[in-house]
Structures are given as C-alpha cells and as structure tokens.
Amino acid sequence: MVICNAIIVLLLAFNTLANPILPSSPNATIVGGQKAKAGECPYQISLQSSSHFCGGTILDEYWILTAAHCVNGQTASKLSIRYNSLKHASGGEKLSVAQIYQHEKYDSWTIDNDIALIKLQSPMTLDQKNAKSVQLPSQGSDVKVGDKVRVSGWGYLKEGSYSLPSDMYRVDIDIVAREQCNKLYEEAGATITDNMICGGNVADGGVDSCQGDSGGPVVDVASNQIVGIVSWGYGCARKGYPGVYTRVGSFIDWIDSKRSQ
C-alpha cells in the first residue's frame, strides 16, 4: 500500500500536507491484524527481487495479479515469486517470472489503474492447503458498503516500522462508501476514482494494510472473490483515512485479454 515512506509520492500541494500520500511501498504489512493460519489465505504470494517487496494473488497456475506500482520499472528476469508458504523468506517454492503486464493507463500521479499481471516461466502446483487460486468477479462488479473483506501480506505491522514480519498476517476490514472516502481524501488533495475501493475503520483507525502489503489481495470473505488490490493510502490505519485499493471488477476484461495472449 502506498504510504508516507512509499516510493511513489504524489507531490500534490506540499504546503497543505503534513505527510505525503503515497502508493503502498514494496515493504508494507498488516496493521491491527493477526498471524494467518494455514489455509486462510492460500492465494497469497510474495513478489521478490533479492527479497520480498510486494504481494500478489494466484489466478491460476501461471498467472499472478498485483499492483502496477509494484512492477513499475521492474524487469521480469530479475523477479520471482514464493508461494505455498506462510513465510516470505522460506518454505514453499520459488518460481521465476516470464513476463510483466502493467496496465497501459496506470497513472503514477493519481495512482489510477493500479493493476498488473505477472506470467510465470513454469506452473505452480495448486490445490494444496497453502496454494490455491482465487475467483475473479464479473466485469463491472462493485463492492457494497459494509462488505467484509480480508487483506493479507507481510507488510509492516505499524506505520514507521522498518522491519518486515517473517510470518504472513491478515486482517478483516469493512468496505467504506466511495463518496465518503473521496471527501476524506479531497482534503489531502487526492481523488478516489471509480477504479478504487476503500476499506477500514474511519472513526477509530487501527486496522489497515501498510508498506510491504502493496499488490496483495483484498478478498471478499463471503464469496472468496478477489475484489481489490492493495494500492495506496495516507499513512497506515490512521483515523479518518481508510486504505485505498484497486477495484478489480473494473478490469476483468483487461485481465482476460492479457491472459488470452
């Protein structure tokens, strides 16, 4: 998720912001959550260069869904993924990346269209307890206010931390109205587009994704569908600023077109 220490900074009105709004950095974690148990988030992968820097979601044996800002400037030959493990640095299996597909209209300024696909060189072995694909929603589908979604990853456990947990964490959060979220972020100079969804505890804060969780899954608990991708926010779990996620339902046609190539 993009936060104060993220790589991509929206230089929106420097004098009006105490802290800049940023895409979730490649080193974020879950705030206010708990350690994931075996089988709870089997679709989660760790995207790695020399080590973990972003999350991703298993779509099938060859394809991974992640955030565009995670792969911005990256070269496929230097990337790998680890799957089938609750730890980002050990266990499971590592596979090399064959190709990166970043959305053509990704905007690093507004962080709109923050979605990318990764194709692997060799297939994953799925249908294991910690290695399963997730379902995609239909094109144009949207979340509803109050829907419960699960966010997972290896990001920082609190804002300002500089140490990644070795274990995967997860947290369940509620979807916040897009209109309400936009009003909150307008004051900070940012815009919530129709390609974004928001989630968290607006009144009290305390639960959110953070640096290092970027690119990871936001899954509807009831349907087990991937409805969001960890994208950006103002700090981590701050009161009055829910996390912002890519709305996957806006991009199903794009996903299908890339996977059919």
UniProtKB/Swiss-Prot annotation:
Active-site residues from the entry: 69 (charge relay system), 114 (charge relay system), 214 (charge relay system)
GO molecular-function terms, A-Z: serine-type endopeptidase activity
Protein EC: 3.4.21.-
GO terms classed as biological process: proteolysis
Disulfide bonds: 54-70, 181-198, 210-236
CDD domains recorded: Tryp_SPc
Residues covered by the Peptidase S1 domain: 30-260
Compartment(s) of residence: Secreted
Keyword Endoplasmic reticulum tagged: no
Annotated GO CC locations: extracellular region
Positions bearing the site annotation: Required for specificity: 208
Pro-sequence residue ranges: 19-29
Record Pfam families: Trypsin (PF00089)
Domain of life: Eukaryota
Secretion signal, residue range per the UniProt entry: 1-18
Sorted UniProt keywords: Allergen, Disulfide bond, Hydrolase, Protease, Secreted, Serine protease, Signal, Zymogen
Family under the similarity heading: Belongs to the peptidase S1 family.
Listed name of the protein: Mite allergen Eur m 3
Organism: Euroglyphus maynei (Mayne's house dust mite)
Taxon lineage: Eukaryota, Metazoa, Ecdysozoa, Arthropoda, Chelicerata
